[in-house]
Amino acid sequence: MPKRTDLKSVLVIGSGPIVIGQAAEFDYSGTQALRVLKEEGLRVILVNSNPATIMTDPEFADATYIEPITPEVVEKIIAKERPDAVLPTLGGQTALNTAIALDKNGVLEKYNVELIGANIAAIELGEDREKFKGVVERCGAESARSHIIHTMDEALEAAKDLGYPMVVRPSFTMGGLGSGLAYNEDDLRRIVGQGLQYSPTSEVLLEESILGWKEYELEMMRDKNDNVVVVCSIENFDPVGVHTGDSITVAPALTLTDREYQKLRDVSIAVIREVGVDTGGCNIQFAIDPATGRVVVIEMNPRVSRSSALASKATGFAIAKIATKLSLGYTLDEIPNDITQKTPASFEPTLDYVVVKVPRFAFEKFPAADNTLTTTMKSVGEAMAMGRNFTEALQKALRSLEQKGSQLDFSSVPEYEVAELIEKAKRPTTDRLYQVQRALLGGATVEQLFEATKIDPWFLDQLELLNEVSREIRQAGALTTDMLQRAKRHGFSDEQIGALTHNSEAVVRGVRQALGIRPVYKTVDTCAAEFAAYTPYHYSAYDEEDEVALHSKPSILILGSGPNRIGQGIEFDYSCVHASMALRKAGYETVMVNCNPETVSTDYDVSTRLYFEPLTLEDVLEVIAAEERTGGVMGVFVQLGGQTPLKLAQQLADAGVPILGTSPEAIDLAEHRGAFSRVLDKAGLVSPKNGTAVSFEDAKKIADEIGYPVLVRPSYVLGGRGMEIVYDEPNLSRYIANATEITPDHPVLIDRFLEDAVEIDVDALFDGTDMYLGGIMEHIEEAGIHSGDSACVLPPITLGSNVVERVRTATRAIAEGVGVRGLINIQFALASDVLYVLEANPRASRTVPFVSKATGVQMAKAAALIGTGVTINQLRTAYKMLPETGDGSTLPLDAPVAVKEAVLPFSRFRTPEGKVVDSLLGPEMRSTGEVMGIDKHFDTAFAKSQAGANNALPTEGKVFVSVANRDKRSVIMGVKRLSDLGFEIVSTGGTADVLRRNGIAATPVRKVAEGSSAEGEGTIADLVVAGEIDMVFNTPSGGEARSDGYELRAAATSIGIPCITTVAEFNAAVQAIEAMRTYEWSVTSLQEHAAALGESQKAAAAKADLQHA
């Protein structure tokens, strides 16, 4: 059936900020969907609060709303835009829950809007655990024995039937939030309590434990003519009990017998029909008992999910794109496969390779958190690799994680350690794979480890095989052709072979290349080479036949940013994608190298060619060699993907690879303290007093000279890893003792910490002659909080025009002194009217997408062209990529105000005792994503940013205030304002006295440390947990009060109420609350903002010309 003709406009709901469990994969699916809708001639309206996404680029939709994704706001957009339909299946759980709410509230009916891509009945059947159980039974399949409960008493009753351990899963949550394993009644009370709170319907499922069973999922699609395809089967390396997002996963499933696979297929097809998904994709998860072969259906997601992004990248079958076409009325047999251009989408993909996905964790950011893996997802990113066999794909995937110790270690294992390793491996943690492999290497048997871990014996055999190959390498003596070929076919890196043969990586590489042992590149074509592929999408293998086609002109390589992690996320992928788009438009062939399956950059049609490879020196050099042999390389961009490719810049240049844009020497100069301070001296600029130390004696001497507090950090890090503010000598000695690897090459940097300074962030472009200043951001939190976690506002709201002018001059002097060609990000601090330079990064920064969205200028595209020799003047005139006059520092007074707010993952991480980790901000970055609020005025923009970050401010109720002595004076005005607005103020001891003396009625409550009174009056933490407080404002002080504050903040985080920890943010919140009480919110699209901005810039230019004349 051809597509429907009655739909003229569609509203797509995005997934909002990147959080654990809902990450970049939804930008990838959303971008594909928007492209399809536009190609089909529809008017496209988008709402998404995350500015770091490609899908919110104005060219992808006709009206792009960067607004909070709440039913109230989406209703405003529907009222204004009047779409014919809403497509909610591409924005994860956020979009689905919003669509369900709009349907329940009667909004869809009121405006006569249809839901496409999924119907409410199918969502309810798939997501509501009680109803889904019925579906499975009607299909003649089994689900685990279970009870649905809504209260704690019901839970305790159900426990009598099910017995411990049991699995607890709330309904309608994402990434396993609020779920867990209860081994006893205490666990049950704790987990069910959280689950009832996180589930929007206060419904929780308790089910029998199927711990240790094998877990699989099938990715399916169905159209309205009842054609069903199974796109991909995925198997989890870890047994049931570890969330699939935290497990190593393998596609296709490798340990199923043919009969078992057919059974899973039959059940899946019956389930998708019974649920009624008929215009899109879904995934279904199964567990199989290894002892009896009993099959149980775990759950299904009636939408595009994390697994569908993985399945798309693993097979080349564009699930999101095809799901969108199905929602418009097409059927699978009418949709062509992009890669082969001959087969329709009703052909199931066939794989002649193995795909392995490995999660990337960030426990180093939360030292107090427990690294046991459970049914609540904790990983922040993932890497994927492909190989001709499992061992090769696994080793490549581990190498792609880029974490110290992420590659398998084959050094010998003493006998006494084996028993300890087996014992440790019983508990699933981030280290389990390594413990299992080391135990096998030390002589443990496959049986022993299967007993301990329930990991399928086939996988354990594969690890044993890797250990065998490592022994052969060690015993070979010399680097022979046979040995190297065997090692390479099992995925060993030159570095690993070097360690086993006592050679350097460079020597191994030299010998290997001299012997002619080089990888070839195979193609992902969805059909195991049955038809030719038109979209070159490659992976390396040590095989016979190379499939890279000849190209007529030299290519430009863009090195991506690898797996997402805290400090290096989707913002860097955004710059890589923009560079590829701009360079292709300018007529270049672009080649993307990356290993992150979630992102837009690894979509097969973003660049001319895609290599799905680890970003290590060895792998990148081989890709460059493959490009050289087939048509030449013009150069490589290393400054778009964050720290990952930057680290390779010097080694690539040493290997004779041309680096485009800023040179490796300039990159080094900005990182090198001494050289950089000479640039500042020459320009007459100052930085906070600082020094570098390689020992505690050095550090003590420097700290005494510059005075405490000091900021200490290792050199060459991103996201403030290992950074700390140190207030005295004992803490300094503790920091140095814990700092790993302080060497003369990697000293510790010590800076004077500027208290009460305003931090300023600048993104600019420089071409060697001219500068274009993209934007000046003023941080809302004071200095000392990592720039990635601080809220910031553009244009700046409290900086005078003379400060802006000084920032401009300083930015230009630094860009020129460093020798930047392209993007540079500089952080300044303004203290007592002195402008200090904190640091300069000659690369794309994490604020580039935000600045681009706020000012309507796509800076990463401009930077890519500057790297190929285009000047800023040409970008203003010929390319029309930059405004003809002025820049981001000369925005007119009526320009919209944009606020960027960080989104933090504290509710996911718990200490071993089950408490939430502390939500205090500091110099080490902890946020996973960001949102943007944009409006005519700062107060409303700030309110929108808080709502978008799931931290909506209250407009009435009780506010708890307790601040450190140093802050008491500065909060009186704000608290008085809240009191005047009718809020009830609640406070402890000292703060309450100060407030009362200033005429503010404050109700006193007990501190956490005081405990409950004899009369049973609870503490402030008890009030928060009981839901009696609407907002917490608590600034930390030292010692006991610190733990008091922690208990309080943990209570606020676990119940999900706003918890403010800095004075500056509190004052902004008071302004925002007042604005919310006074004005109605309006919604404005980026396209409307850009048009208005253009008008006022023209008017300003005309006025300036008149004055000249």
Swiss-Prot record:
GO cellular component: cytoplasm
InterPro entries recorded: ATP-grasp (IPR011761), ATP_grasp_subdomain_1 (IPR013815), CarbamoylP_synth_lsu (IPR006275), CarbamoylP_synth_lsu_oligo (IPR005480), CarbamoylP_synth_lsu_oligo_sf (IPR036897), CbamoylP_synth_lsu-like_ATP-bd (IPR005479), CbamoylP_synth_lsu_CPSase_dom (IPR005483), MGS-like_dom (IPR011607)
Signal peptide interval: none
SMART domains: CPSase_L_D3, MGS
SUPFAM superfamilies: Carbamoyl phosphate synthetase, large subunit connection domain, Glutathione synthetase ATP-binding domain-like, Methylglyoxal synthase-like, PreATP-grasp domain
Stretches for region Oligomerization domain: 403-546
List of residues binding Mg(2+) 3: 827, 839
Binding site for Mg(2+) 1: 285, 299
Region Carbamoyl phosphate synthetic domain: start-end pairs: 547-950
Any one GO molecular function term: carbamoyl-phosphate synthase (glutamine-hydrolyzing) activity
UniProt note: domains: The large subunit is composed of 2 ATP-grasp domains that are involved in binding the 2 ATP molecules needed for carbamoyl phosphate synthesis. The N-terminal ATP-grasp domain (referred to as the carboxyphosphate synthetic component) catalyzes the ATP-dependent phosphorylation of hydrogencarbonate to carboxyphosphate and the subsequent nucleophilic attack by ammonia to form a carbamate intermediate.
Assembly information from the UniProt record: Composed of two chains; the small (or glutamine) chain promotes the hydrolysis of glutamine to ammonia, which is used by the large (or ammonia) chain to synthesize carbamoyl phosphate. Tetramer of heterodimers (alpha,beta)4.
Protein family: Belongs to the CarB family.
Name of the protein described by the UniProt record: Carbamoyl phosphate synthase large chain
Source organism of the structure: Pseudarthrobacter chlorophenolicus (strain ATCC 700700 / DSM 12829 / CIP 107037 / JCM 12360 / KCTC 9906 / NCIMB 13794 / A6) (Arthrobacter chlorophenolicus)
Upper classification of the organism: Bacteria, Bacillati, Actinomycetota, Actinomycetes, Micrococcales
